[in-house]
Design a protein with these regions (language model features):
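Core catalytic region of metal-dependent phosphoesterases/phosphodiesterases
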Residues: 2-5, 9, 14-113
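N-terminal short leaders/motifs
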Residues: 51-74, 168-200
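Short, flexible active-site-adjacent loop segments at beta-strand->alpha-helix junctions, enriched
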Residues: 87, 108, 117, 122-125
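Structural motif
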Residues: 113-114, 237
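Active-site-proximal loop/helix segment associated with metal-binding centers of metalloenzymes
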Residues: 123-188
């Protein structure tokens, strides 16, 4: 089977809000990966795949065996895998690289596929503004913060994280609506990059949890990948067109 497509997904938030809900979602993600494995040249997991993740030197959070096993299967079959650090799983280090041959992306990634240019980012703290969050993100990613957290016993550190996951507001969200003002930041980013001589066809991100595919600038498109608690959306590029699609188990 010819592997020629690029697939993009984000915000699985595995671990939230509880074990049963997360396991059901993990099974659906695995079914989706199984569905795309024959034609997937590359799979981009674009942040907040886990509601929490921290790699101690010799310990990783337990669980997610089905997902990791399926990713290993894809990697062994020649599919390239990319993991973007999100705001919930920014403490991914080298475990996935060693075990899954996965490329770990800390911030943005710029690439070209079949003549189309892509700007990829989880979506947190990108563009102008949001200086408070950017400072907090820098603090959490610092070696000092990571060292301090690693001093806590995994039962305490992961236990606290799981407690906060159980309070996830995302799982309780019933209705969302799109506001045009929410596009100002991505429009500003597109203009800023264009002024620097960088033109992109697609800006693909997650983080904001609302699936959308809208035109920005002259010819660019902004695709938000949504999330998998309420929407189960993903994007696929077949070398000609990029589409935002909904995963249905019966598909």
């Amino acid at each position: 089977m010819n592997k020629y497509k690029q697939y993009f997904a984000s915000d699985f938030h595995l671990g939230a809000p509880n074990y049963d809900s997360s396991r059901d979602r993990e099974n659906q993600v695995v079914a989706w990966l199984d569905f795309i494995k024959d034609d997937a040249a590359e799979v981009f997991l674009m942040g907040d795949i886990f509601d929490f993740w921290f790699e101690y030197r010799t310990v990783v959070p337990k669980g997610y065996i089905r997902l990791l096993g399926k990713l290993a299967e894809l990697s062994d079959a020649g599919t390239k895998l990319y993991f973007f650090k999100g705001n919930h799983d920014m403490w991914v280090f080298d475990y996935f690289k060693k075990e899954l041959n996965m490329h770990i992306i800390s911030d943005e990634m710029e690439m070209e596929r079949n003549g189309k240019k892509f700007f990829l980012h989880h979506g947190d703290g990108v563009g102008n503004g949001d200086s408070g969050y950017k400072l907090l993100k820098k603090l959490f990613r610092s070696k000092v913060c990571q060292w301090l957290f690693a001093r806590a016993h995994p039962n305490l550190g992961v236990g606290l994280a799981n407690y906060w996951s159980s309070k996830s507001k995302l799982a309780k969200r019933k209705e969302m609506k799109f506001e045009e003002l929410e596009l100002n930041w991505i429009k500003s980013l597109e203009v800023s990059l264009t002024q620097k001589g960088k033109k992109f066809d697609y800006f693909i991100m997650g983080h904001r949890h609302f699936p959308m595919d809208v035109k920005i600038g002259d010819n660019a498109r902004y695709i938000n990948l949504g999330e998998w608690i309420n929407f189960k959306t993903y994007a696929v590029f077949d070398g000609q067109q990029l589409r935002l699609e909904h995963w249905k188990p019966e598909s």
